[in-house]
């Protein structure tokens, strides 16, 4: 343990910025400072995101001097895979270790339309949702843009073996994305850029628990990214019980921000609604939810919850899920039930990391 601590301390003291944190224009600016032509930025991005090399020596069309400058200035290492769990349905959950010893989760989900990745934006989470394993242990730190980018790069490297690609992504992993707004936006722009992994903006979804000021800010961004709200309750009292953030950002104010976003962007918003047995899954809850969303351009995604040992919530019975869905549909709400994936592995958000933390403290 003492050796591990010393190694992590050394990593912190000697850490260079990640090259994966740089957007193309930032790389061009750096090259200009080094007296190098800016077209080299495109070549560097090609090595990073198309060929996905792991060291600067492989960047054969760059001069030795430029490779040395890159090596002296930026870290090219990505993430260390601690655990890789594969479900019977093809879902793969990765537990990655960061340079400072913290760990994060990333999930690859396979669909008929392609491969989707769920990325993490923070080590832990401060929001405190009572149903989520991600909040166990609290928030440790924000991820850098490059650490979020590296999750996609590492998963894409795993897919390279079978000549597959990441075709879409959701920012719904550990942490509150809008609490790490600048790094989130840097990540999205790098991944979306044609010189990056070039995942289309409309194939990316960002989810928030409801940080209202950032919703207004997000509405002004120029990326056509899908937007989702973790709602989980049809009224303020129940939402405050499930999601303490509702005490700071009240549901009526949240709905006003959502309406502004929809009117400003013209885009439909998705409401994520986890179903918790006996808590928020009754017909009266569905009726109340339909009334809350009346007139809002939206889609509701019903989520049968994964069981989390550290929490007391139970799964809603299958027939009750269908009744909830029917109640919404009968009232004109666009709704679907999320297909469960990774049910036979630690699929709940933060669950694999929580298990690893338990092992570390034994």
UniProtKB/Swiss-Prot annotation:
Binding-site list for [4Fe-4S] cluster: 125, 129, 132
S-S pairs: 118-349
Record-annotated active site: 105 (proton acceptor), 349 (s-methylcysteine intermediate)
One term of GO molecular function: 4 iron, 4 sulfur cluster binding
Origin: domain of life: Bacteria
Keyword annotations from UniProtKB, A to Z: 4Fe-4S, Cytoplasm, Disulfide bond, Iron, Iron-sulfur, Metal-binding, Methyltransferase, rRNA processing, S-adenosyl-L-methionine, Transferase, tRNA processing
Binding-site positions, S-adenosyl-L-methionine: 175-176, 207, 230-232, 306
Entry's cofactor comment: Binds 1 [4Fe-4S] cluster. The cluster is coordinated with 3 cysteines and an exchangeable S-adenosyl-L-methionine.
CDD domains: Radical_SAM (cd01335)
Enzyme class, spelled out: transferase
InterPro entries named among the record's database cross-references: Aldolase_TIM, Methyltransferase_A, RlmN_N, RNA_MTrfase_RlmN, rRNA_lsu_MTrfase_RlmN/Cfr, rSAM
GO BP annotations listed: rRNA base methylation; tRNA methylation
Named cofactor requirement(s): [4Fe-4S] cluster
Residues in Radical SAM core domain copies: 111-344
Spans through the membrane: none
Pfam families: Radical_SAM (PF04055), RlmN_N (PF21016)
EC number: 2.1.1.192
Catalytic activity, reaction form: adenosine(2503) in 23S rRNA + 2 reduced [2Fe-2S]-[ferredoxin] + 2 S-adenosyl-L-methionine = 2-methyladenosine(2503) in 23S rRNA + 5'-deoxyadenosine + L-methionine + 2 oxidized [2Fe-2S]-[ferredoxin] + S-adenosyl-L-homocysteine; adenosine(37) in tRNA + 2 reduced [2Fe-2S]-[ferredoxin] + 2 S-adenosyl-L-methionine = 2-methyladenosine(37) in tRNA + 5'-deoxyadenosine + L-methionine + 2 oxidized [2Fe-2S]-[ferredoxin] + S-adenosyl-L-homocysteine
Function according to Swiss-Prot or TrEMBL: Specifically methylates position 2 of adenine 2503 in 23S rRNA and position 2 of adenine 37 in tRNAs.
Misc. comment: Reaction proceeds by a ping-pong mechanism involving intermediate methylation of a conserved cysteine residue.
Family: Belongs to the radical SAM superfamily. RlmN family.
Protein name: Probable dual-specificity RNA methyltransferase RlmN
Organism: Bacillus anthracis (strain CDC 684 / NRRL 3495)
């Amino acid at each position: 343990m003492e050796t591990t601590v010393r190694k992590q301390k050394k990593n912190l003291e000697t850490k260079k910025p990640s090259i994966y944190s740089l957007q193309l224009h930032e790389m061009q600016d750096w090259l200009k400072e080094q007296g190098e032509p800016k077209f080299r930025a495109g070549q560097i991005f090609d090595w990073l995101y198309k060929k996905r090399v792991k060291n600067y020596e492989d960047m054969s069309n760059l001069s030795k001097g430029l490779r040395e400058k890159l090596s002296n200035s930026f870290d090219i290492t990505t993430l260390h895979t601690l655990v890789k769990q594969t479900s019977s349905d093809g879902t793969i959950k990765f537990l990655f270790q960061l340079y400072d010893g913290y760990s994060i989760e990333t999930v690859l989900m396979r669909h008929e339309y392609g491969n989707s990745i769920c990325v993490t934006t923070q080590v832990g989470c401060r929001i405190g949702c009572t149903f989520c394993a991600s909040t166990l242990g609290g928030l440790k730190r924000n991820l850098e843009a490059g650490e979020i980018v590296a999750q996609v790069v590492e998963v894409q490297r795993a897919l390279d073996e079978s000549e597959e690609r990441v075709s879409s992504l959701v920012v719904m992993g550990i942490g509150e994305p809008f609490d790490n707004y600048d790094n989130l936006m840097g990540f999205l722009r790098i991944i979306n850029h044609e010189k990056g992994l070039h995942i289309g903006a409309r194939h990316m979804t960002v989810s928030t628990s409801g940080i209202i000021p950032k919703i207004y800010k997000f509405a002004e961004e120029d990326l056509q990214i899908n937007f989702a709200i973790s709602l989980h309750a049809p009224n303020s009292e129940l939402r405050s019980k499930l999601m303490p953030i509702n005490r700071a950002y009240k549901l009526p104010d949240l709905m006003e921000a959502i309406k502004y976003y929809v009117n400003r962007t013209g885009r439909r918003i998705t409401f994520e609604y986890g179903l918790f047995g006996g808590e928020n899954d009754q017909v009266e809850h569905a009726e109340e939810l339909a009334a809350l969303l009346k007139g809002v351009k939206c889609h509701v995604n019903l989520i049968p919850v994964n069981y989390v040992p550290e929490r007391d919530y139970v799964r809603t019975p299958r027939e009750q899920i269908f009744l909830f869905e029917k109640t919404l549909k009968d009232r004109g709400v666009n709704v679907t039930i999320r297909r469960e994936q990774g049910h036979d592995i630690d699929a709940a958000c933060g669950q694999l990391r929580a298990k690893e933390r338990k092992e570390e403290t034994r």
